[in-house]
Amino acid sequence: MQLNSSMSAVITGGASGLGAATARLLASKGVKVALFDLNVEQGEALAQELKGVFCKVDVTSQEDCESGFAKARETIGQERILVNCAGTGNAVKTAGRDKQTGAIKTFPMDKFELIVQINLLGTFRCIALSAAGMMTLDPCDEFGERGVIVNTASVAAQDGQMGQASYSAPKAGV
C-alpha cells in the first residue's frame, strides 16, 4: 500500500512508545492520524503536533472503542490503516514465596485477566471495528485492497522469560 495524504490511520496506544513512533512515521508520509490512548495529556500533545486527532479510548471497553472510531472517522475520515500498539505487562512471577512468611502465593487472576483484556481482546475489538469500516471503502489498488491492519505482538510470545507469563500468553494470541 502506498501511503499518501488521502489516507487516515488509527493507532492504538498512540500516545507513547511504539504507537507514538508509528504515528509520527505515518504523519511524516502525509497520512492523517487518530491516536487512541488513555493518556490524555500526551495524546492531545502528540495529536496537536501531528495535526491529528486524539481519542481517549480504553481498549477493554467496546463502548470506548466504538466511540473512538466514530470520532476518528468524523474528524479524519474512514481509516485505511489500523496499527494496534496498545498493550501492557506485569513482570511478576506466576507463583512465589512471601519473603516474610514463606507462604506460597500466586499471581492474582484479576491482574492476568486485565492484561489479556488489553493485549489480546482489545486488539481484536479494534480489528473487528476497523475491518467493518474498511469494508465500506472502494479498493485503493488493482488488487482490491481496502486497507491494512498491523498488530504488534512480541518475541516474548515465543521466548518468554520468568515473570512474563501474563504478558507472553496474550501476545502469543495476537
Where are these regions (language model features)?
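Active-site loop immediately N-terminal to the catalytic Tyr-X3-Lys motif
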Residues: 159-168
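Conserved glycine-rich Rossmann-like NAD(P)H-binding loop of the short-chain dehydrogenase/reductase
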Residues: 29-45
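Rossmann-fold cofactor-recognition segment
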Residues: 49-63
